[in-house]
Amino acid sequence: MTKVVILGGGFAGCAAAHMIRKKHKDWDIILLELTDKLGAGNRTQFYGGHPHTFGPRHFLTPWNYTYEYLDELLPLRKLDHSFYTYVERDSNFYSFPMSYEDIDTMPDKDIIYEELKQGTNIKDPSNLEDYWLKKAGKTLYEKFAKYYNQKMWLVDSNKELDAGYDDWSTKGELIYEKKGQNFHDMISAYPKDPLGYDKYFDIATRDIKILYKKKVSRVDFEKKNVYCSDNSNYDYDVLINTISVDILDQMCFGELRYVGVDFIPIVLPIKQCLPGNTFFLYYSGKEVHKRIVEYKKFTLHESEHTLIGLEIPSMNGKHYTMPILSEISLYKKYIDNQGDDVFNIGRAGSYEYIDIDDCIDQAMKVASKI
């Protein structure tokens, strides 16, 4: 009988378990989870009776097949929401990604348009700072990207950010004509269930053996064996990994860099905090926080009060992989050392800044290969 061991019970691990079980009814599938619950940051928590996830875990995708997969198991409610950033130097909120409609209202619009017209002498940008200076100019860079990315990634200079910056830093086009044109071709949704995604994790692992509080200490790729800190070990024919790959090799090549988040829940004595279709706000200046989220907008929780979550980048956890080429090279070095029959998926496993839909897509691809 083929033995499959899955490391990590977040979205990627649960999706892989569900899809592999559907395809192979008789395989022995074990999922090892570090904590005592499945779902990781997508699992519903409570503060003052208010349900919330760790950050705004809305389902956002350009792929209808990932939406249909999840919606069939866990009915989703489609969302229409606006994205805004507070720019302290202007004492104003603007849509993000940026728009010419907003630029026309800025006090320094003449300078901005002149910078956009002149461009820079940077021919081939090789990092986030140069990319923004070339595409948007100094003023817009400082308003929207300079300080936000320095605090988001905990770096002294955005020149350190030299991988994929033209994709993740702009969330689409750099500047749109009108406000709110971003994500017009994507599906945004959230579960109708009051417990959010929790039922999905139960459904996905219904026929899977789950072992909780299992801290992986290393993997012997030659013997195909996973060793845990409690001295237990599990042999495998196929290994699905969703945790940081440096852990599997005892960080023999060095530790991969991540950024974490300090999450601060705050209940306010009002029914609604943010207006209209605004679910969360970004803060792009020198303030320590990067985002606030109003969770009732997602959960539709009924209360005379409302819960917001304040997010401050920190070294607390491994929530964001680093968009730095040297870190990606280190990741690939670990992958090359793993041998056959190992599949790395999820944000930590693939060392990519990805979301729920990507995890589902990766799980689908793995299931199709084995």
Regions found by a protein language model. Give the residues of each.
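Beta1/beta-strand and adjacent pyrophosphate-binding region of the FAD-binding site
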Residues: 1-12
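Conserved Rossmann-like nucleotide-cofactor binding loop
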Residues: 12, 37, 246
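Glycine-rich FAD pyrophosphate-binding loop
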Residues: 21-46
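Mid-domain catalytic core of redox enzymes
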Residues: 23, 217, 221-224, 228-333
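Dinucleotide-binding Rossmann-like beta1-alpha1 core, especially the glycine-rich loop
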Residues: 48-122
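Active-site/ligand-binding neighborhood in enzyme catalytic cores
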Residues: 92, 104, 108-225, 232-235
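C-terminal catalytic lobe of FAD-dependent flavoproteins
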Residues: 321-370
